[in-house]
Amino acid sequence: MTLIAPSFAALRPALGAAARAGDLDYVEIVRNSGPVVMAVLLLLLSASIVSWAIIFKKWLRLRQAQVQSLEFLDAFWQSRRLDSIYQKAEALSASPVSQVFRAGYVELSKVTARKGGENESPLVDQMGGIENVERALKRAAMSEVTALEATIPFLGTTASAAPFIGLFGTVWGIMRAFNDIYQMGNANLATVAKPISEALIATAFGLFAAIPAVVFYNYFVSRIRVLDSEMTNFSNDFLNIVRRTFFA
């Protein structure tokens, strides 16, 4: 017992310092960060804010696209007139599938207008009627995918770059912390805790920006892939209907 008591007495200052370190004010740590670490934190915070704005806006856009596409497909297969479906497609402008149909319908109208409303397959073949419709569908689908993918690359960039930017801030902060410790000539827990926490908070900011970005980036890419598949399937079905009806 006489040997253990002095050991606890010697540890008491260190334990007190650890307790004080546990009560660190992280807001104050951020405010007292050096210029380089502060610039890193502001950059990561800005990237996180922009990412969340993109996530919210893109989630609403893709949800609207999916709902209206399902509504349009139901109307398409229940209707017997292309002109009435075209009016429905105009009302469902957020649906990429409806916009693909509109492009195909407009091109089909041009082809039928050229042949005077008569079903003359040789003349239509010479003008490349069905090929024109197919190209119009493909162009519209590519345009819709491009529009849906807008701003998503920023999420991918944030997901891949933010951890490294945060790591840079941490490395810089640790270098600064060790320099301060060297100048003070004292390396106890109370001296080390605050500057090391200041350095590590940059990594925390990097992860805070990167994790939602990578999760929603993969989610949005998956949703867009589904919509792209729906546009492709619809284009094939629409071309089959056009061939049977106008080019048989």
Task: Enumerate the language-model features and the residues they cover.
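Alpha-helical transmembrane segments
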Residues: 45-65, 167, 174, 209-224
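Predominantly long cytosolic amphipathic alpha-helical stalk/bundle segments
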Residues: 66-165, 176-188, 215-248
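Hydrophobic alpha-helical transmembrane segments of polytopic membrane proteins
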Residues: 199-213
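Residue-level signature of catalytic and energy-coupling elements of molecular machines
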Residues: 34, 52, 85, 101, ...
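Hydrophobic alpha-helical transmembrane segments and adjacent short intramembrane/lumenal linkers
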Residues: 185-199
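Short, strongly hydrophobic alpha-helical membrane anchors
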Residues: 1-32
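Juxtamembrane loop-transmembrane helix junctions in multi-pass integral membrane proteins
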Residues: 22-38, 147-153, 157-160
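Transmembrane alpha-helix/interfacial motif
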Residues: 2, 33-80, 84-85
